[in-house]
Amino acid sequence: MAEAAAAAAAAAAAGETSASSGSAAERDPDQDRAGRRLRVLSGHLLGRPQEALSTNECKARRAASAATAAPTATPAAPESGIIPKKRQELMKWNGWGYNDSKFFLNKKGQLELTGKRYPLSGVALPTFKDWIQNTFGINLDHKTTSKASLNPSDTPPSIVNEDFLHELKKTNISYSQEADDRVFRAHGHCLHEIFLLREGMFERIPDIVLWPTCHDDVVKIVNLACKYNLCIIPIGGGTSVSYGLMCPADETRTIISLDTSQMNRILWVDENNLTAHVEAGITGQELERQLKESGYCTGHEPDSLEFSTVGGWISTRASGMKKNIYGNIEDLVVHMKVVTPRGVIEKSCQGPRMSTGPDIHHFIMGSEGTLGVITEATIKIRPTPEYQKYGSVAFPNFEQGVACLREIAKQRCAPASIRLMDNQQFQFGHALKPQVSSIFTSFLDGLKKFYITKFKGFDPNQLSVATLLFEGDREKVLQHEKQVYDIAAKFGGLAAGEDNGQRGYLLTYVIAYMRDLGLEYYIIGESFETSAPWDRVVDLCRNVKERIRRECKEKGVQFPPLSTCRVTQTYDAGACIYFYFAFNYRGISDPLAVFEQTEAAAREEILANGGSLSHHHGVGKLRKQWLKESISDVGFGMLKSVKDYVDPTNIFGNRNLL
């Protein structure tokens, strides 16, 4: 009975796919929703129906997506998190995020964010202008120039093996050799990459972009690449900040950009085991949106949630801001399917834990596209929390704030998210405060400032602020909140209000747009991260920030750089630290060289002070010069041996890590 019902559900879901084989604009959203519910139902009844369901839908998708040198695609609707084939119709080709979202200074000199996607969109931020002028010494009348559009004649030509192309056409896997599609997938979002897009061009870009729609498509692509000795560079959301997507300049083989964005479905949800089986190209925001319809979430929320994908999370060992409740990606993944040149890697069962030698999953997690393509994954889900509350705490200084976070970690009572900003980062956040709506609100803000700085004696140039996010059962959240604030009080912390905490988290998804604004005014900057033991956190933060200031001064940067940090994740034995640095490069002949030398010096300082090479950004090509010393010669040799066995002819040749 259950098998028959599940078979009917699977058949209906497959039929829905066939019926919706037209463009995205022709699809009925109610029909799509019904199809997802049928997949959920089939998951309940059979537990693991994905094999038959995936094959049926894969065939339907391939039939609907005939191979073409210039595939057309309808941009995703604003409420959808699906990345379209033609990414440039929805997203910036030479900057961060959506085309309709951009920071600018209006006629009154107030900062605004265009579009309607974010809570800050259309909101006037009146104090930012003074902050950016005072911090960087810039003249707002001096603006840089950049290329307004991509000129195909400026891009390297596409060189594709003709025999491969002939066989590819038989598979009906969609592809493109157009310059804009190839350039869009030739980079991530490191400062160097964006700078090149604005003012130059990459020496090497993919020769062809392929859009598989299911696991079987990926198997065919990898087999063809092995047959013709081609290079594959997988891409998910394209949010890499480690040069992970940059094509090796001396690669002479045809380079395939294998774009997983059309592998974006939840294949089933199992409410008994609280797991969901998903395709690896689904973005974080789309995954959360669909799960929310059924009352669930993963809780995995990296800052790149809008665009990064499940496959990208796994391949870089990602971390989310609410890991204190839900865990990092290594805690969430139950099962995965990976296509390699040697074949498919997949465990035979989905048990919660196994003692079967070294965990095969951990060979894939953090492999950064060097071993194969992650096509599907089973991940843990949780019921959507019933209650969420923000908060903030002001400390007299950064050191006392760190001591408080250490005690919270020791007592294992950290909220879903806790972030501690140093003073400069607090000042930056304060510069992004919206215009007050009334005299009364302004008066209250003045009272709060007076109370903290005059009555309690906090120095405005020393104080540090922690933002908090609690979620779960309402009664437990309120108890948890009291426990955290009681600990904070022992370290001189003062409750600074729910609004300040919420505003801090509202900036999470728009802060990346700020770099594009800076580039317009001769400001280049970047963020980078590390993790360190608790007893090294304060010294590491101080020494790295000072090293950045010293390096910039020695290299001729005329105005002191912005050099700031925050503690953004806490653990029993240490913390993750995020650094931001930026400087005014006007008058410097080679700003990229100065930037890269300063960033490298900061990384050297991190390692010298007991920090890790990376907490969650990964290694890529940007940091691989330090990998061997980080994991030892023997450890490095082990990684290389795995690579040599799984991919002996270097089909996955992005040259990350090794």
UniProtKB/Swiss-Prot annotation:
* A cellular component term, taken from the record's GO annotations: peroxisomal membrane
For the site labelled Important for enzyme activity, the residues are R419
EC assignment: the record states 2.5.1.26
Give its localization: Peroxisome membrane; Peroxisome
Keyword Ribonucleoprotein recorded: no
Q: PTM Phosphothreonine: list the residues.
A: T74
* Residues at which substrate binds: R515
- Alphabetized Pfam families for the sequence: FAD-oxidase_C, FAD_binding_4
Q: What is the effect of changing C576A?
A: No effect on activity
Q: Respond yes or no to whether keyword Ligase is given for this record.
A: no
Under InterPro entries, the record lists: Alkyl-DHAP_Synthase (IPR025650), FAD-bd_oxidored_4_C (IPR004113), FAD-bd_PCMH (IPR016166), FAD-bd_PCMH-like_sf (IPR036318), FAD-bd_PCMH_sub1 (IPR016167), FAD-bd_PCMH_sub2 (IPR016169), FAD-linked_Oxase-like_C (IPR016164), Oxid_FAD_bind_N (IPR006094)
Domain FAD-binding PCMH-type, chain residue ranges per copy:
202-384
Changing S367A has the effect of:
Strongly reduced activity
By sequence similarity, the record places it as follows:
Belongs to the FAD-binding oxidoreductase/transferase type 4 family.
Protein's name according to its UniProt entry:
Alkyldihydroxyacetonephosphate synthase, peroxisomal
